[in-house]
């Protein structure tokens, strides 16, 4: 089956997804049909890109908005005269982890719930996403230079797929919170939960045998664990009495996600700049195609004169 077929469709379903093991330690070798392997997305998809930069935007989504933002970012990168930073982009339902490819230093960790839009600028072979800042409510557009158009498409579809899974986790967390609040009001316990083991009522959680706590403690990249103070740790693991693992979702992140959801065409799906034709094209690709040169034969840095 084509490698990106499931990414272009309705993606992975829950709650069966929550029963899959999350091997949070090492990144496994990418299978040929990676989108048909649920554990691969849960573990995290890794892409090698070049970071163009960031600019602020006024709205959480929009094709023209993102195109203009990317144009500003590219112009700034060209004017700087510096070589682009090689980065590793890891995408999972938890979010995007950005690290320096040379030093393995953590650059940024963005929760998937803060991302409002992503797109692939086909002519420029650029992947870009818009996310709400962790420090304030400003919206940032980050752009990355890909080796070819098909990679930009693959990253875009992967982020959209991860968002779909994360949204389902969020729905579970909301339902779990409502059950606990109702049980608290009635003075009773919800079957299958232990009130002395759960977070406070101000915290939303998603439960299920999602991942092994010991594995989660192992950073996916060696330096990520050393830089956890710089990471957005709004999602934290907790263990219930039935050995299920909990995703905590603090009120600030919950509010940000709810607000961004209102701006989406479909609250359950991350808006992308891909057309049906783009998605169909991406569905015909496999990871082995990413290493093949484009028919144009131009090196990407030559196109941008970097």
UniProtKB/Swiss-Prot annotation:
Primary localisation category: cytoplasm
Residue span of motif [DE]-X(1,2)-F-X-X-[FL]-X-X-X-R motif: 255-264
GO terms (BP aspect): amyloid precursor protein metabolic process; cellular response to cytokine stimulus; cholesterol homeostasis; cholesterol metabolic process; low-density lipoprotein particle clearance; positive regulation of low-density lipoprotein particle clearance; positive regulation of receptor-mediated endocytosis; positive regulation of receptor-mediated endocytosis involved in cholesterol transport
Region (AP-2 complex binding): 247-274
Residue span of region Disordered: 178-204
Residues carrying N-acetylmethionine: 1
This protein's record includes keyword Phosphoprotein: yes
Pfam families: PID (PF00640)
Phosphoprotein found in the keyword field: yes
Segments carrying motif Clathrin box: 210-214
Recorded consequence of changing residue 55 to M: 10-fold reduced affinity for LDLR
Keywords of the record: Acetylation, Cholesterol metabolism, Cytoplasm, Endocytosis, Lipid metabolism, Phosphoprotein, Steroid metabolism, Sterol metabolism
Superkingdom classification of source: Eukaryota
Domain PID span(s) in chain numbering: 44-168
A single cellular component GO annotation: cytoplasmic side of plasma membrane
Record's subcellular location: Cytoplasm
Subunit annotation: Interacts (via PID domain) with LDLR (via NPXY motifs). Binds to soluble clathrin trimers. Interacts with AP2B1; the interaction mediates the association with the AP-2 complex. Interacts with VLDLR. Interacts with LRP2.
Function: Adapter protein (clathrin-associated sorting protein (CLASP)) required for efficient endocytosis of the LDL receptor (LDLR) in polarized cells such as hepatocytes and lymphocytes, but not in non-polarized cells (fibroblasts). May be required for LDL binding and internalization but not for receptor clustering in coated pits. May facilitate the endocytosis of LDLR and LDLR-LDL complexes from coated pits by stabilizing the interaction between the receptor and the structural components of the pits. May also be involved in the internalization of other LDLR family members.
Domain commentary: The [DE]-X(1,2)-F-X-X-[FL]-X-X-X-R motif mediates interaction the AP-2 complex subunit AP2B1.
Protein name (database record): Low density lipoprotein receptor adapter protein 1
Species per Swiss-Prot/TrEMBL record: Rattus norvegicus
Designated gene of the protein: Ldlrap1
């Amino acid at each position: 089956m084509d490698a990106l077929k499931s990414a272009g469709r309705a993606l992975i379903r829950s709650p069966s997804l929550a029963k899959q093991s999350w091997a949070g330690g090492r990144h496994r070798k990418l299978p040929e049909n990676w989108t048909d392997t649920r554990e691969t997305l849960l573990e995290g998809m890794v892409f090698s890109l070049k970071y163009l930069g960031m600019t602020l935007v006024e709205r959480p989504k929009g094709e023209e908005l993102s195109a203009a933002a990317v144009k500003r970012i590219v112009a700034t990168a060209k004017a700087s005269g510096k070589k682009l930073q090689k980065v590793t982009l890891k995408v999972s339902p938890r979010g995007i982890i950005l690290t320096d490819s040379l030093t393995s230093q953590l650059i940024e960790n963005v929760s998937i719930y803060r991302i409002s839009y992503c797109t692939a600028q086909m002519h420029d072979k650029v992947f870009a996403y818009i996310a709400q800042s962790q420090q304030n409510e400003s919206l940032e557009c980050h752009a990355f230079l890909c080796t070819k158009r098909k990679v930009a498409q693959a990253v875009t579809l992967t982020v959209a797929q991860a968002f779909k899974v994360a949204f389902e986790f969020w729905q579970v967390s909301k339902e779990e919170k409502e059950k606990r609040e109702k049980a608290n009001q009635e003075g009773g316990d919800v079957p299958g939960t232990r009130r002395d083991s759960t977070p406070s009522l101000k915290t939303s959680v998603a439960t299920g045998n999602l991942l092994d706590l010991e594995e989660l403690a192992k950073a996916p990249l060696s330096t990520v664990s050393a830089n956890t103070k710089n990471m957005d740790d709004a999602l934290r693991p907790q263990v219930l009495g039935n050995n299920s693992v909990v995703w905590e979702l603090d009120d600030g992140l919950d509010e940000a996600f709810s607000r961004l959801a209102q701006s989406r065409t479909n609250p359950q799906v991350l808006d992308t700049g891909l057309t049906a034709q783009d998605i169909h094209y991406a569905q015909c690709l496999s990871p082995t195609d990413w290493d093949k040169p484009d028919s144009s034969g131009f090196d990407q840095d030559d196109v941008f004169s970097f």
